[in-house]
């Protein structure tokens, strides 16, 4: 999906939640409104979310008052294994949930020590993600 960056033009505020940027975000917002559960996932880049996830979160401003009562799950991966390496990433996810009325956070999975493609396969986070998915 293609998601452009928020321009902070607030066209959405003047047009009932319709963004001036014509990309895939309108479809994503429709799906977020319709969903009961939202899973946010990102690799950790410089102790934060990646640019694509940041763009999605920022563009949610167009309908932040209509996206409500959601259950949130978070999945993060990082090359480092430290306990605090994902704190800022988690805060970015939590920040979105805090802005959406009635939302609750249900689960967090941290895949630590993964850098190369496929490394996650042997980590406990892979099984945790599977188990969490079965519970949703």
Regions picked out by a protein language model, each given a short descriptive name:
Residues 1-41, 45-63, 104, 117-136:
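N-terminal beta1-alpha1-beta2 submodule of the flavodoxin-like/Rossmannoid cofactor-binding fold
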Residues 44-46, 78-83, 113-117:
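Short histidine/acidic/glycine/proline-rich micro-motifs that form metal-
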Residues 51-52, 64-108:
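Short, glycine-/small-residue-rich phosphate/pyrophosphate-handling segment
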């Amino acid at each position: 999906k293609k998601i452009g960056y928020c321009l902070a033009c607030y066209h959405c505020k003047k047009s009932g939640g319709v963004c001036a940027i014509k990309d895939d975000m309108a479809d994503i917002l429709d799906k977020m409104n319709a969903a009961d559960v939202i899973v946010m996932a990102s690799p950790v880049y410089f102790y934060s979310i990646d640019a694509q996830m940041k763009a999605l979160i920022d563009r949610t401003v167009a309908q932040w008052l209509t996206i409500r009562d959601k259950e949130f799950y978070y999945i993060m991966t990082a090359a480092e294994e430290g306990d605090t390496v994902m704190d800022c990433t988690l805060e970015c996810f939590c920040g979105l949930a805090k802005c959406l009325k009635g939302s609750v956070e249900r689960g967090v999975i941290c895949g630590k020590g993964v850098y190369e493609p496929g490394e996650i396969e042997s980590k406990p986070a892979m099984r945790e993600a599977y188990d969490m998915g079965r519970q949703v």
